[in-house]
């Protein structure tokens, strides 16, 4: 059964020293799949929807800010669900993301990673706390300036070879070079090395 709703009532609550008005978000409850979908507002653009576990619905809807398609991630061509919160101590607004609310506070140097790389899938089963490096390796696209067509494979002008290079323990490591006519082999090798060094955080080819 699908249930449709809207939290359009005005709610004034205390957030630190900052008073905020909650404008609300449309939502859909899918009881059969035990999920809910929250509409993300976008200025003058079509809305997007984010998926959460049904047991997180009250937490998300009762949060004192409206959820928007807040930040674009070019690596996955999609938007994070979030809001902008004004902090008087900094005299500026800072982003706060829905996945942070769902998972809770992370330790220093930690990030929340979307396992399937769908950043609008905020079900707890799709979220995990990782290091900054692990979060960076779990990606779907090669760098925008990549000419080889393969992740972690680039042309080295000096040696005139295809170079396989990965970030390992925070450092860029040159692993192996391949001749000009061995590009496909270089791509296969790069994929194997990602699996070796990154494991479940290797991302897509």
Q: Can you say where each PLM-predicted feature lies in the sequence?
A:
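Short helix-coil boundary/hinge micro-motifs
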Residues: 2-84
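Short, surface-exposed linear segments at secondary-structure transitions and domain or protein termini
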Residues: 56-65, 103-110, 181-191
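Polar, enzyme-active/binding microenvironments
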Residues: 151, 180, 203
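A short, exposed loop/beta-hairpin motif centered on an aromatic-Gly-Thr core
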Residues: 171-183
């Amino acid at each position: 059964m699908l249930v449709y709703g809207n939290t359009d009532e005005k709610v004034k609550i205390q957030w630190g020293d900052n008073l905020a008005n909650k404008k609300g978000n449309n939502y859909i409850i899918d009881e059969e799949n035990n999920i809910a979908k929250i509409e993300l507002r976008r200025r003058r653009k079509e809305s997007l929807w984010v998926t959460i576990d049904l047991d997180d619905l009250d937490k998300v809807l009762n949060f004192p800010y409206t959820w928007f398609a807040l930040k674009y991630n070019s690596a996955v061509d999609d938007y994070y669900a979030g809001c902008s919160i004004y902090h008087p101590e900094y005299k500026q607004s800072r982003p706060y993301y829905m996945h942070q609310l769902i998972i809770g506070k992370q330790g220093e140097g930690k990030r929340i990673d979307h396992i399937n790389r769908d950043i609008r899938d905020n079900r707890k089963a799709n979220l995990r706390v990782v290091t900054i490096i692990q979060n960076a390796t779990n990606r779907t696209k090669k760098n925008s300036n990549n000419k080889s067509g393969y992740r972690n494979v680039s042309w080295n002008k000096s040696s005139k070879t295809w170079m396989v290079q990965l970030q390992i323990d925070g450092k860029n490591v040159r692993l192996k070079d391949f001749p000009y006519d061995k590009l496909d082999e270089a791509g296969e090798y790069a994929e194997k090395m990602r699996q070796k060094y990154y494991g479940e955080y290797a991302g897509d080819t």
